[in-house]
Amino acid sequence: MSFQRPEWVEPRDYQQRAVQSWAAAGGQGVLEMATGTGKTVTSLLTAAHVAEQMDDKMALVIAVPYQHLVDQWADDVRDFGGNPILAYESRKNWQERLEGELAEFDLGVRDSLVVITTHTTFASASFQRVLSRVNRDRFMLIADEVHHMGAPHLKESLPEAVQLRLGLSATPERFYDDEGTEELFEYFGEIVYQYGLSEAIKNGALCEYYYIPHVVELTEDESDAYLKLSRKIARLASRSGGDLGDTDLQDNKDLQFALFKRARLIGTAERKIERLVELLKQEDEIKHTLIYCGDGTVEGEIEDRTRRHVDATETTLRAELGLRAERFTADESRDERQDLLARFEAGDIEALVAIRCLDEGVDVPATRTAYMLASSSSVGGVSCVNTLENTTP
């Protein structure tokens, strides 16, 4: 079966321009497109263009950050005629099939090969060994949320042999990592097309929404800790040249950890949950509500703190408001997550309390309101609970 655009998919003008821009750049580059504008479909339209140029003989590898995105991408790939191999978790679930289909592809028995994997599996030694056997002249790589691929443990796994490289992200530049960002663009190519939030809303590609910040004061202990961390950050930054914006955190782990620790403090501020409850009590009806907790970019010890925060939020919503609230985190299995999303859309779950998993690219069209407790916005001793409200009826 050919990898091609299904008849019922009508590319929007901006998607066609994105495909043309990437092709004009020699088959390399990054698409910087606002979340919700159809980066997935745009990239698959690009792959369909490549397949047509190659007489349908193409090996396509798609790397995404999280397991639940593998399943989401798989549905779209099947719409384009692909029969993807889902390569993540245990090798026994995918390696034999991948090696078999790769052998058929090399022999010319199979026209197309499509693999969807997580960034973690992509970087693994076992996957890299298989990847090294792919015909470089017919190999295309799509990296979803490409900014993640600039991390030290991931950028080393990017295969130099592959010539067709497409990166996708609403925010391709890495936070306080100029070196990682530069190496990312050196590999994937520069940003070849941009489609921002304002333009997308103006053109009707995204719905309008209200963004409402709610100020929350830090407790006395949190304020003291925040000031101490800020002084430490200033001191460490001064040793690196004095300008935090010009500091490469990869060369200053102490500064990196201090910034993450301060972000954790703001993201899990004690009074945010109290303010959230106050706001929800003002609602006539609570349904199809997303609540974001913690900072998905923070790992290790910091991750433990944010997990406790998400648990506390869910428990409070149940106990004080009687809400049918459920967690949506990396701890839930693939089947559990799919069930949660289905129940949320049906209205059986009134609120999903999420950390990290919903931040990047998961489709939840039923959402009416989102509360973001994880905002890093702060001034002195205050932080914010941010509300997004869909204005579409």
Q: Which residue ranges define each predicted feature?
A:
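A short beta-strand element within the Helicase C-terminal
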Residues: 353-355, 360-375, 381-386
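Conserved pre-motif I regulatory segment
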Residues: 1-32
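Post-DEXD/H (motif II) to motif III coupling segment of the RecA-like Helicase ATP-binding lobe
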Residues: 148-209
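Walker A/P-loop
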Residues: 26-48, 353
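Conserved helicase ATPase core of P-loop NTP-dependent helicases/translocases
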Residues: 93-107, 127, 290, 309-359
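Conserved helicase/translocase motor-coupling segment
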Residues: 236-340
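Conserved Walker A/P-loop ATP-binding site and its immediately adjacent core
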Residues: 40-45, 56-80, 297
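Conserved helix/coil segment N-terminal to the catalytic DExD/H
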Residues: 93-137, 148-156
